[in-house]
């Protein structure tokens, strides 16, 4: 069974936009980086698409996605959209020796983290979603989660009932 990103972690973002990747996520990143042999592991941060967060993929998972995009007919609207939002609006990231990254300016813009918030200190939420993880501005994540749950699942309902609808 493949390694998976699981859990939810709030991490401080310092004035230089550095943030520590949660240790369990670092293990998955390392396992998903074919070139990793100790030292600094790499992953891909995608800031494209109409959403309030960035998504992060292991190198292996991103290779799978790129193969699927390559399989689409050249020049089609679907392929162009995916190329732009998953490839062009993406960055290769490398963990530093302390397991941190510097959130890139485009990523900070996507999350809505302002320079003033960096100076005063802010938090990011890391949310594991199996084959990828999301990075959110912490207060945006909390608000979005509450709103989403109200729409998808009635209060008191068993969340596993959502799997029954798919036959899984």
From Swiss-Prot:
| Recorded superkingdom | Bacteria
- CDD domains, alphabetized: MraZ_C, MraZ_N
- Answer yes or no on keyword Magnesium: no
Start and end residues of each SpoVT-AbrB domain = 8-51, 90-140
Instruction: Using the record, list the residue span of the signal peptide; answer none if the entry has no such feature.
Output: none
The record's Gene Ontology biological-process terms are: negative regulation of DNA-templated transcription initiation
* InterPro entries, per the entry: MraZ (IPR003444), MraZ_C (IPR035644), MraZ_dom (IPR020603), MraZ_N (IPR035642), MraZ_sf (IPR038619), SpoVT-AbrB_dom (IPR007159), SpoVT-AbrB_sf (IPR037914)
Mainly resides where? cytoplasm
Q: Which GO terms describe its cellular component?
A: cytoplasm; nucleoid
Tell me the Pfam families matching this sequence. MraZ
Subcellular location, record wording: Cytoplasm, Nucleoid
Please name the GO terms that the record assigns under molecular function: DNA-binding transcription factor activity; transcription cis-regulatory region binding
Q: Which residues form a coiled coil?
A: none
* Keywords tagged on the record: Cytoplasm, DNA-binding, Repeat, Transcription, Transcription regulation
Matching HAMAP family? MraZ
Subunit structure of this chain's protein: Forms oligomers.
> Would you identify the family this protein belongs to, as annotated?
Belongs to the MraZ family.
Question: Mind telling me what this protein is named?
Answer: Transcriptional regulator MraZ
Q: Which organism is it from?
A: Cereibacter sphaeroides (strain ATCC 17025 / ATH 2.4.3) (Rhodobacter sphaeroides)
């Amino acid at each position: 069974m493949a390694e998976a990103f699981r859990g939810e972690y709030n991490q401080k973002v310092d004035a230089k936009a550095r943030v520590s990747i949660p240790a369990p996520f670092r293990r998955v990143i390392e396992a998903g980086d074919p070139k990793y042999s100790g030292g600094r592991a790499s992953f891909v941060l995608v800031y494209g698409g109409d959403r309030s967060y960035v998504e992060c993929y292991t190198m292996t998972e991103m290779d799978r996605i790129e193969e699927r995009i390559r399989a689409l007919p050249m020049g089609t609207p679907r392929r162009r959209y995916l190329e732009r939002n998953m490839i062009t609006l993406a960055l290769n990231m490398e963990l530093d020796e302390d397991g941190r990254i510097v959130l890139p300016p485009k990523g900070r813009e996507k999350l809505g983290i302002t320079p003033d918030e960096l100076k005063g200190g802010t938090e990011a939420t890391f949310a594991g979603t199996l084959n990828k993880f999301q990075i959110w501005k912490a207060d945006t994540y909390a608000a979005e989660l509450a709103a989403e749950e109200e729409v998808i699942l009635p209060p008191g309902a068993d969340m596993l009932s959502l799997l029954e609808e798919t036959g899984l």
